[in-house]
Curated annotation (Swiss-Prot):
The gene is Bzw2. SMART domains: eIF5C. PROSITE patterns: W2. It comes from Rattus norvegicus (Rat). InterPro entries: ARM-type_fold (IPR016024), eIF5-mimic_regulator (IPR051245), W2_BZW1/2 (IPR043510), W2_domain (IPR003307). Gene3D superfamilies: 1.25.40.180. This is eIF5-mimic protein 1. The modification N6-acetyllysine is found at residue 117. It holds the Pfam family W2.
């Protein structure tokens, strides 16, 4: 039975479109080329950087980014979990990598420069490198203590020079790393290297931007997640700046919660005695100073009412409102420093809210008569402790009252001498 031949077009060539071509996935070929080049460059990191720069045009860094970074850090391709795939075959590994380097800051910084140059040259590797570092932090248990230390130093230096974002640290919150104490130990080494590159303010600013400032306690198991434990651990390790930072962050969080609750109670017009008891309990429980609380109270009291938009009416409304809450403010302005904080808060509020500009002196006099502010605090504020905002306006408003206070003080002194 004869088969009919299908017609054939002659003179035509059909090429596979480039996007349809499939590259054979051969990370082993990539590995062998990379390992050979690194071994030839040896300990000369300038030569390593040049090799990586030129080889990027021949090797597919984009496709094999994880293999590239595995070898540069660990000297070998890594299996899931962090074990070395080629551990038994030394020809497929290199000792010219971060894990085989000397454990000192300057040496690891030189390696960090290799990564910087590579990523500047091949910008598309930036995200892949970030993912690689997150992965390596998850694999910490598979690495020796010395390797963990070098990885911590590398991470800290790269965080310091901006090559890596602080979000890589989220890998440290993995349960297994936290429970075995690896997370906290690694974090200490990382932060030390970071602070050797940048000051504490820069480090804490990066943590805030990455929303990690409130998660630092998670480096420890649940039963040790206290500010005191964190502070001792990090202070003992020479990182007191981080301990202080965490205390401030925790205090800010507590203050926000306290302000929210206070606002709620004032809006419900709770009796002042109840509010006083609540605030005192919170101060004791959270170790809050009176200077912090008086500022919160002022803000809450002023937020508890909708103010008249007319300047001539707002002063009368403010005095009526503040007279009601003067007993509350008086309880928490028992110290000279607290009184000065309150005076500065009043000054700033009156400056920021233009309708209150002319009410400042009247508010201060009201607080003086209600025993919220003492004569000493008002005189100190006038002479040296006033804020910069609108100071000329407010000092001028207070001039006559201050003169009256000074005259009264002189009279009482002369009466005391006569008696």
């Amino acid at each position: 039975m004869n088969k009919h031949q299908k017609p054939v077009l002659t003179g035509q060539r059909f090429k596979t479109r480039k996007r349809d071509e499939k590259e054979k996935f051969e990370p082993t070929v990539f590995r062998d080329t990379l390992v050979q080049g690194l071994n030839e460059a040896g300990d000369d990191l300038e030569a390593v950087a040049k090799f990586l720069d030129s080889t990027g045009s021949r090797l597919d860094y984009r496709r094999y980014a994880d293999t590239l970074f595995d070898i540069l850090v660990a000297g070998s391709m890594l299996a899931p979990g962090g074990t070395r795939i080629d551990d038994g075959d030394k020809t497929k590994m290199t000792n010219h990598c971060v894990f085989s380097a000397n454990e000192d800051h300057e040496t690891i910084r030189n390696y960090a420069q290799v990564f910087n140059k590579l990523i500047r040259r091949y910008k598309y590797l930036e995200k892949a490198f970030e993912d690689e570092m997150k992965k390596l932090l998850l694999f910490l248990k598979a690495f020796s203590e010395a390797e963990q230390t070098k990885l911590a130093m590398l991470s800290g230096i790269l965080l310091g020079n901006g090559t890596l974002p602080a979000t890589i640290l989220t890998s440290l919150f993995t349960d297994s790393l936290v429970k075995e104490g690896i997370a906290a130990s690694f974090a200490v080494k990382l932060f030390k290297a970071w602070m050797a590159e940048k000051d504490a303010n820069s480090v804490t600013s990066s943590l805030r931007k990455a929303n990690l400032d409130k998660r630092l306690l998670e480096l420890f198991p649940v039963n040790r997640q206290s500010v005191d434990h964190f502070a001792k651990y990090f202070t003992d390790a020479g990182l007191k700046e981080l301990s202080d930072f965490l205390r401030v962050q925790q205090s800010l969080g507590t203050r926000k919660e306290l302000q929210k609750e206070l606002q709620e109670r004032l809006s419900q017009e709770c009796p002042i005695k109840e509010v006083v008891l609540y605030v005192k309990e919170e101060m004791k429980r959270n170790d809050l100073p009176e200077t912090a609380v008086i500022g919160l109270l002022w803000t809450c009291v002023m937020n508890a009412v909708e103010w008249n938009k007319k300047e001539e009416l707002v002063a009368e409304q403010a005095l009526k409102h503040l007279k009601q809450y003067a007993p509350l403010l008086a309880v928490f302005s028992s110290q000279g420093q607290s009184e000065l904080v309150l005076l500065q808060k009043v000054q700033e509020y009156c400056y920021d809210n233009i309708h209150f500009m002319k009410a400042f002196q009247k508010i201060v006099v009201l607080f003086y008569k209600a025993d919220v502010l003492s004569e000493e605090a008002i005189l100190k504020w006038y002479k040296e402790a006033h804020a910069a905002k609108g100071k000329s306006v407010f000092l001028d408003q207070m001039k006559k009252f201050v003169e009256w206070l000074q005259n009264a003080e002189e009279e009482s002194e002369s009466e005391g001498e006569e008696s």
